[in-house]
Structures are given as structure tokens and as C-alpha cells.
């Protein structure tokens, strides 16, 4: 099995401007992500960015980069532009790794690619168990429920499944049936081409979760429990400080 990792790295960020170039132990954040992807055994790693400064930083680190349009509405649209420009075939496996995950375990990058290769779904992703009620009720922690074969039934910012009997008594404890979705995806390139041809769905606009477009149009998403739990991603200056601390002490 071979696969390509594409790392969308948008320069603009309301909470952390220039995020892909944030320095972490002497390297731009996006370069750390690129290194994790290479460690996974990917045949090819491409950073997709809308900013020439990110392009320069990746090239200086010896990486491959595609300068994309700046008007994409999502990382998946940016991914689709790269797929078309590089001429990937419909059966090629593409893994989308977020550009703000410098601590992502390389093992789960390979895991999601292998899961897709073994599945008939056009798309695969990962999740981890939720262990605290705080996380279960946090709308920023996206929950996913699956069917018996590991295909997604729904993703939500709400607490799903709703434990009616337990929560009628107390919301301080939870059972072991909650999963938090991780923002890593594997697709067949042809699936991405179909995805971007679909109009946005009502559900994704309500929840602000673009993967709901896939379920809306009747397609399957394979979900597995990740072999390793990723550490914090970088959305804020506080996140960046935590990641710098973790990497400085490795």
C-alpha cells in the first residue's frame, strides 16, 4: 500500500496569525507536521499553502509544497486543488493531516491510510475514547457514533449517544461508549473529486462539521479507534506555549 499525505497550511488565523510558521524549537510548525508525515512511511508528503512565506519555509526544509489559491472555503477544497494539479488517479490514497498538529503520532497517519485501503468506503477517519464528562459535554470536542461495522452514523458537537438513564441521575460521570473524533482523514482521490462537487448540506452548516456532507449524500465514512492519542493541536498562543514545552522536554 502506498499513500500521499497532503498538509493544508492556511496562513491566516484569527487567533494565531501566521500559524504555520510559528517557531517550535527552531523549526516552523508546518515543518514538524511534515516530518511526522514522513515518519509514517508516506510515499509522498505535500504541503498545500496559500502563502509564499510558507512555501519558502517548506522548500528550505527540503519539503514539497504546492502554492494554492487563497479563496478556498475548507481544507478539503484546498486538497482537491492539489489532487487536480498533480493528476492523482481516482484510486490513489490521500491522507489529510492538519497543519497545526506538530505532535501528531506518525503511527495514526499510517493507520488511517491502512484502514481506508482495507475498506470499501471512500473515506476513513479516527476517534479516541472520551473519559471525562467535561469532554463529553464540550461542544468543541466532536463526538461520533458508529454502526456495528465501524461506519459513522453521525458526528455532532452535542453529547451523543445521550445516556438517558445515567444523565437523568447525574451528568458528573459517563459510560465508556463516547468517542471523540480526530481531525485526520484518508480518502481515495476520486472521492475528493465527488465531495467538492456536492453543495454544502444543511447539517454541516448547522454543526459546522464538513464531514457531515458525506453522510448527507449517503456515502460511508470508516471510523476506528486510534492506536495512539494525539497531544494538543495549536489553535491559540496558549496551545503553542504548551507544544513548545512538550517538544523542548522530549
Curated annotation (Swiss-Prot):
It comes from the Bacteria. GO terms for biological process: CMP-keto-3-deoxy-D-manno-octulosonic acid biosynthetic process; lipopolysaccharide biosynthetic process. Pathway: Nucleotide-sugar biosynthesis; CMP-3-deoxy-D-manno-octulosonate biosynthesis; CMP-3-deoxy-D-manno-octulosonate from 3-deoxy-D-manno-octulosonate and CTP: step 1/1; Bacterial outer membrane biogenesis; lipopolysaccharide biosynthesis. The keyword Cytoplasm applies. One of its GO terms (cellular component) is cytosol. InterPro entries: Cytidylyl_trans, KdsB, Nucleotide-diphossugar_trans. It is an enzyme of class 2 (transferase). This is 3-deoxy-manno-octulosonate cytidylyltransferase. The lineage of its organism: Bacteria, Pseudomonadati, Pseudomonadota, Gammaproteobacteria, Enterobacterales. The gene is kdsB.
